């Protein structure tokens, strides 16, 4: 008595089709599918943004020292 049989669900489906029509149900389905697709793309974008960028390479002091030496030589 607690669950409905297949015939109950078919009658409910027929009433829904008669009330709303197939065109509105099709539009509702495509709108719902688009919303789910947009949500999934939004979640995928959020995951890509949350990944940290790779660490930058450290600059050695040698190149800075050579630049200073070059500037000192041009001043003399």
Swiss-Prot record:
Keywords: Cell inner membrane, Cell membrane, Membrane, Protein transport, Translocation, Transmembrane, Transmembrane helix, Transport. GO terms for biological process: protein transport by the Tat complex. One of its GO terms (molecular function) is protein transmembrane transporter activity. The keyword Cell cycle does not apply. It is a single-pass membrane protein. Residues 64-76 have a biased composition (Basic and acidic residues). Belongs to the TatA/E family. HAMAP family: TatA_E. The chain crosses the membrane at residues 1-21. Part of the twin-arginine translocation (Tat) system that transports large folded proteins containing a characteristic twin-arginine motif in their signal peptide across membranes. TatA could form the protein-conducting channel of the Tat system. This is Sec-independent protein translocase protein TatA. InterPro entries: TatA/B/E, TatA/E. Pfam families: TatA_B_E. GO terms for cellular component: TAT protein transport complex. The Tat system comprises two distinct complexes: a TatABC complex, containing multiple copies of TatA, TatB and TatC subunits, and a separate TatA complex, containing only TatA subunits. Substrates initially bind to the TatABC complex, which probably triggers association of the separate TatA complex to form the active translocon. It is found in: Cell inner membrane. Residues 41-76 are annotated as: Disordered. The keyword Transmembrane helix applies. The lineage of its organism: Bacteria, Pseudomonadati, Pseudomonadota, Betaproteobacteria, Nitrosomonadales.
């Amino acid at each position: 008595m607690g669950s409905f049989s297949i015939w109950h669900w078919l009658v409910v489906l027929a009433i829904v089709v008669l009330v709303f029509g197939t065109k509105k149900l099709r539009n509702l389905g495509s709108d719902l599918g688009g919303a789910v697709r947009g949500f999934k793309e939004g979640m995928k974008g959020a995951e890509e943004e949350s990944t940290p960028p790779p660490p930058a390479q450290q600059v050695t002091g040698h190149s800075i020292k050579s630049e200073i030496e070059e500037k000192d030589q041009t001043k003399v």
